[in-house]
């Protein structure tokens, strides 16, 4: 291909090919890529997310957004845990979160119209996000998140292709879990490069 990739992207592709997941994810965390975990209840995605959180530099200001407390951050002293309930939505929490000057925002699950707000946060100075979504496989994740984003007031006024391309260029890595094993790993910097330039 004629796509110029950075050395670290080649290193990640090599690590992925060799199933060297520790190297792959350490680079992904260091480069502040946005990572999405996929899988059903009990699939292992929360346990894996905790392992990724431990890889984040400990002086990072973390904001976690959850409905029930799952993500402990014992090594990150500069953190805030925010919770959404029926009367306080994830969308409202994301808006409030911006005032807390986070380095990284960890949203445990994308479920509804907050998806667009979270994508916007990742694209406006807060990269390195970790989140999860329910989808059938790794390749369908971008489409699922785009569907959720279209439920927002902003999303309703935008073309679907624009939203989908925003998702494809924002979510860098997708990990699909099935019965506590990671069965799929998506990372395609070539596709991202082409989408950013309108060539896909």
Question: At which residue positions do the language-model features occur?
Answer:
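P-loop NTP-binding catalytic core
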Residues: 1-30
């Amino acid at each position: 291909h004629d796509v110029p990739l950075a050395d670290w992207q080649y290193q990640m592709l090599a690590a992925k090919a060799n199933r060297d997941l520790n190297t792959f994810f350490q680079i992904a965390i260091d480069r502040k890529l946005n990572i999405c975990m996929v899988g059903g209840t009990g699939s292992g995605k929360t346990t894996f997310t905790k392992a990724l959180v431990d890889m984040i530099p400990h002086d990072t200001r973390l904001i976690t957004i959850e409905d029930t407390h799952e993500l402990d951050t014992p090594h990150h002293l500069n953190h805030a845990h925010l919770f959404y309930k029926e009367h306080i939505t994830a969308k409202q929490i994301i808006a409030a979160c911006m005032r807390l000057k986070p380095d990284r925002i960890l949203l445990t699950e994308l479920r509804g119209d907050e998806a667009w707000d979270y994508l916007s946060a990742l694209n406006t100075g807060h990269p390195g996000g970790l989140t999860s979504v329910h989808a059938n496989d790794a390749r369908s994740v971008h489409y699922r998140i785009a569907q959720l984003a279209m439920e927002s007031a902003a999303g309703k006024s935008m073309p679907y292709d624009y939203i989908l391309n925003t998702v494809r260029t924002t979510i860098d890595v997708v990990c699909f879990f099935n019965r506590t094993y990671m069965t799929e790993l998506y990372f395609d910097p070539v596709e991202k490069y082409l989408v950013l330039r309108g060539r896909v």
